């Protein structure tokens, strides 16, 4: 319970970190130069994605998992100091001066938040329980889906009534570039965050890698994300147009994820390194571009809201499709274990073994079949990521072709 509450509190704090950094950037750097800096921030995200699993694995293997949380304290303290002393609060339009306390609270859209959070929780529980804990036709799963649908409809109604004071203001979201960029990053975020979670599991279960080893084997994708993000940021700064990079991102990512579905236990390093580089290059090229798209079409006063919408879509896509991937993986593993290792009376028991323990905990006579079952269930999961990357092309093709050099924007010194 303490861990759950602690992670919830940490999640509340972390919710504004990425969008907050991008909002600070919007108030500090001209739009024409912003892609380069946004790419740099994206590269830091990739660097954190590299160092995080490696450090987490090292802490877990050699010290204690608690250091995965302790390490955030000094880093957070330095960040707080830097923002507090070096970034002055910029002037803002539509401030809450003169409003009563009740009116200020209403502007936070508490009703929308109260409705939306349980809607997402119901949807995630339904996706995680369906086919594993309970059959898809079980009344609990059906009820959760129904509750999620009803709550989402109520949320949409609240957003319509609140208009500019809504969590998702219709005036902003219904702009062509905003909703298409949000859909693009929703799909791509689901693919990328899901693969960051499940690719290491493939290395652990199929290639017998340790927690640290799987992080190292995942480096080709994450390093290429960093390099491509910086290159794309510089290219957009020089050329001005971001839409071609969004489209190329969808194409490369779909190809890369599609190739991972061909992996087998005997797949060589050239294949799993090369395919990860394709994925990373695609993700790095386009992952930051939706932010530039919405900042180009919106006025400076709306940029924080537009930026938050894109980051929100990315996070929501990751949360939903990690749950979907978990369902595909769990159901597939049970099915494939029954197929390849029929002598195991309870195939679902393999789920409790864990990817890092199968080599040590299972008898030698069943190990090849279990490894094949892990491989096939994980490649089925990679199909989800490939489909998401392919679906992101819909949003990519709808994003307007505009240049960051074609729109002078108000900027405040920082």
Q: Which residue ranges define each predicted feature?
A:
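Transmembrane-helix exit segments and adjacent C-terminal regions of multi-pass membrane proteins
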Residues: 356-414
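Interfacial helix-cap and linker-helix signal at transmembrane-aqueous boundaries
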Residues: 3, 55-63, 127, 203-204, ...
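Transmembrane core module of solute transporters
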Residues: 111, 136-305, 399
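Hydrophobic transmembrane-helix bundles of small-molecule transporters
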Residues: 63-183
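Helix-loop junctions at membrane interfaces in 12-TM secondary transporters
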Residues: 1-7, 64, 262-276, 332-336
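Structural signature of transmembrane alpha-helices in multi-pass secondary transporters
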Residues: 10-11, 41-49, 53, 112, ...
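Small-residue-rich alpha-helical segments with characteristic i,i+4
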Residues: 44-57, 67, 272-349, 380-384, ...
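Helix-loop-helix hairpins in multi-pass membrane proteins, especially solute transporters
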Residues: 1-111
């Amino acid at each position: 319970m303490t861990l759950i509450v602690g992670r919830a509190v940490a999640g509340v704090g972390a919710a504004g970190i990425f969008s907050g950094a991008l909002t600070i950037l919007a108030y500090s750097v001209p739009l024409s130069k912003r892609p380069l800096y946004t790419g740099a921030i994206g590269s830091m995200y990739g660097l954190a994605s590299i160092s995080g699993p490696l450090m987490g694995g090292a802490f877990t293997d050699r010290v204690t998992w608690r250091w995965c949380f302790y390490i955030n304290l000094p880093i957070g303290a330095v960040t707080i100091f830097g923002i507090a002393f070096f970034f002055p609060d910029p002037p803002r339009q539509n401030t809450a001066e003169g409003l009563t306390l009740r009116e200020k609270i209403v502007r936070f859209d508490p009703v929308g938040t109260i409705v939306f959070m349980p809607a997402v929780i119901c949807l995630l529980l339904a996706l995680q329980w369906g086919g594993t804990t309970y059959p898809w036709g079980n009344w609990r799963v059906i009820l959760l889906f129904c509750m999620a649908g009803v709550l989402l409809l109520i949320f949409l109604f609240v957003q319509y009534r609140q208009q500019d004071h809504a969590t998702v203001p219709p005036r902003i979201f219904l702009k062509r570039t905003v909703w298409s960029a949000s859909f693009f990053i929703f799909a791509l975020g689901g693919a990328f965050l899901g693969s960051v979670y499940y690719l290491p599991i493939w290395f652990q279960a199929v290639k017998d890698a340790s927690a640290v080893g799987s992080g190292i084997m995942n480096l080709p994708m994450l390093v290429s994300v960093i390099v491509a993000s910086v290159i794309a940021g510089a290219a957009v700064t020089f050329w001005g147009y971001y839409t071609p990079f969004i489209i190329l991102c969808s194409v490369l990512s779909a190809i890369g994820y599609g190739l991972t579905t061909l992996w087998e236990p005997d797949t060589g390093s050239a294949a799993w390194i090369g395919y990860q580089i394709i994925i990373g290059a695609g993700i790095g090229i386009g992952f930051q571009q939706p932010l530039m798209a919405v900042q180009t079409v919106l006025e400076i006063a709306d940029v924080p809201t537009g930026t938050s919408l894109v980051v929100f879509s990315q996070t929501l896509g990751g949360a939903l499709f990690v749950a979907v991937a978990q369902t595909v993986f769990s159901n597939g593993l049970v099915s494939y274990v029954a197929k390849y290792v029929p002598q195991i009376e309870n195939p679902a028991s393999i789920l409790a073994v864990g990817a890092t323990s199968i080599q040590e905990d299972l008898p030698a006579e069943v190990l090849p079949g279990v490894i094949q079952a892990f491989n096939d269930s994980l490649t089925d999961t990679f199909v989800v990521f490939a489909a998401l990357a392919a679906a992101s092309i819909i949003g990519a093709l709808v994003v307007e072709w505009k240049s960051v050099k074609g729109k002078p924007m108000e900027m405040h010194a920082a």
